[in-house]
Amino acid sequence: SKAPLDKQLDLTLLNMSKKSKKPKRSAYNNITRRELIQLAMIRSDNTAARLLCQTYPMGFNRCIDDMNTKVHSLGMLNSVFYDPTGLDDRNNSTASDLIKLASAAANYPEVVHASHQSHLKIKIQRHWFSGNNTNPLIGSRHDIQVSKTGWTTKAGGCLVMLLDTDKGRRVVVVLGSKSTRTRIPEAEF
């Protein structure tokens, strides 16, 4: 969507308690979409990824539909998404499709900026969000343009990186690593 990235989002209605009908306090209230992108990309924050879809201008389901439409328009014909976090076991992709996704992601300045950050520290109201990038190569390798990590029991440790090297643009994809710790050594070359 072309939704504004720097507008603060009022998440009060999303945080309503079903029992008490009163809003629960949320550290994410008054966060911006840009900050949610940073949290989702740098810390692999699943709540942030989910909130990006929950605050999508046309609703959560349309967000998922648009994600699938976008990946298919990129030629990612073996990919399907059921949720924005990657945690749903029905989500599926392939290494060749993820190469296409990484290449397309390089056209989004917010994604590239977040991929370059080795550490995140932002303040939302009185709450600090901080943490290191889930890819420890960020900061030590300056050729990484796009990076995203993931892990589920079914998929194992996963990593996608787009690098601009002296030999040209390269994409590294690691799928099915035994743990989040082994995906990085498997990716280094």
Describe each region flagged by the PLM.
Residues 1, 17-29, 105-119:
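Short N-terminal secondary-structure initiator segments
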Residues 1-11, 98:
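Active-site SXXK
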Residues 2, 43, 51-52, 74, ...:
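Short alpha-helical scaffold segments that flank and stabilize functional sites
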Residues 6, 49, 108-112:
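Internal amphipathic alpha-helical segments of the cytochrome P450 catalytic fold
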Residues 8-22, 88-89, 119-122:
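Acidic helix-start/capping segments at beta-turn-to-alpha-helix junctions
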Residues 13-15, 44, 75:
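Short, small-residue-rich loop/turn micro-motifs
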Residues 18-54, 129-146:
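Conserved catalytic neighborhood of penicillin-recognizing serine enzymes
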Residues 33-34, 57-189:
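Penicillin-recognizing serine hydrolase domain
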